[in-house]
Amino acid sequence: MDKLVIEGGYPLSGEVVVSGAKNAALPILCASLLSAEPVHLENVPDLQDVRTMLKLLGQMGVQIESGDGRVSLNASKVDNLVAPYEMVKTMRASILVLGPLVARFGHARVSLPGGCAIGARPVDQHIKGLQAMGAEITIEHGFIEARAKRLKGARIVTDMITVTGTENLLMAAVLAEGETVIENAAREPEVGDLAHLLVAMGAKIEGIGTDRLVIQGVDKLHGAKHTVIPDRIEAGTFLCAVAAAGGDVTLRKVRPLILEAVTEKLREAGVTVEEGDDWMRVRMDKRPSAVTFRTSEYPAFPTDMQAQFMALNTIATGTSQVVETIFENRFMHVQELNRLGANITIDGNTALVTGVEQLSGAKVMATDLRASASLVIAALRADGETLIDRIYHLDRGYDRMETKLTALGAKVRRVSGSQA
């Protein structure tokens, strides 16, 4: 099992190109199931989760060609409507095949999902919405089985804002008979990116980017070409890395407008951030100021940046509160940050972070995707060497992170378990 070894204390400088968004690429790959014609994608990140999704789609009969950030998918010969436990357990986003399969083929059998162990994240909103559209759904032996001759348009009000739920129901609705209205829809840019691809495939969707999506169902979708949006969480992670380690870095292929909640807090911490249409420059030459924040749905501060910003707060002047409102059990990185010398206490869904002048390198363990990123950020600032175990979590969501950091001047190397 690979590990990362990071020697702290080196400021970052140079340029980094932000990869395509994982959380946009995964539903967009699933959307290829909605058409018998080819879908051509660009700016697809090379991540473990993407490879897992492509493997799942391939097992279903989708013909796939991929390389150099491009993926072409042809779902004209799909012959397997099952997403097995072996695939789904490693990646929760596998649930996103449910809506497209039921909408186009009238049947799907999908194992209950896994992924990061950060809370229950139930799929009941997906099921409730599909049932409102006329699907018959049973759950037994660990599988969700859904059947429908043709889905019918419906008004769906989700009990909570759910990103994957919105995406699944949106993909189901585009081939349903009549009008579907999704109220309380997630407004995340990745949902909007999926919607733009669906429109390019012939779907009729109004309200993209709002919490009310109105879909007029069509009989079939055609092929399309689409470029995946930049990954705002990868961009935010690099911004926090520079803020912690110090330095002067320019990010390319980024959308500053979808990062405003993060950049606002970085400026509050004393970081200098400049931005253009598709670039950002971040500079830091001092110890950051502690920043209190709470996570919430887009456009508020993203839960996927909570751990990285907490790592920044560990070496800040002052004390900060971090309130996590989206997921329970998303403070698993706290124990590992404290091993590096951080001073963090937890009370329910709130973490109290008292900044320290210096962290010290130690052996730590990644517990989930964003937690692993927080440990990398802390290690860049720590005195001495930090060894991060279980970095397969990092590989699920970051495209060549150690390569990009090394190019910026960080001392990072990947070692196999036998070398560590």
Swiss-Prot record:
Binding residues annotated for phosphoenolpyruvate, in chain numbering: K22, N23
Keywords recorded for this protein, A-Z: Cell cycle, Cell division, Cell shape, Cell wall biogenesis/degradation, Cytoplasm, Peptidoglycan synthesis, Pyruvate, Transferase
Localization: Cytoplasm
Keyword check for Cell wall biogenesis/degradation: yes
SUPFAM superfamilies (UniProt xref): EPT/RTPC-like (SSF55205)
EC numbers, comma separated: 2.5.1.7
A GO CC annotation given for this chain: cytoplasm
2-(S-cysteinyl)pyruvic acid O-phosphothioketal: residues bearing it: C116
Active site annotation, chain numbering: C116
Catalytic activity: phosphoenolpyruvate + UDP-N-acetyl-alpha-D-glucosamine = UDP-N-acetyl-3-O-(1-carboxyvinyl)-alpha-D-glucosamine + phosphate
Family note: Belongs to the EPSP synthase family. MurA subfamily.
Function: Cell wall formation. Adds enolpyruvyl to UDP-N-acetylglucosamine.
Protein name: UDP-N-acetylglucosamine 1-carboxyvinyltransferase
Native source species: Paraburkholderia phytofirmans (strain DSM 17436 / LMG 22146 / PsJN) (Burkholderia phytofirmans)
Source species taxonomy: Bacteria, Pseudomonadati, Pseudomonadota, Betaproteobacteria, Burkholderiales
Originating gene: murA
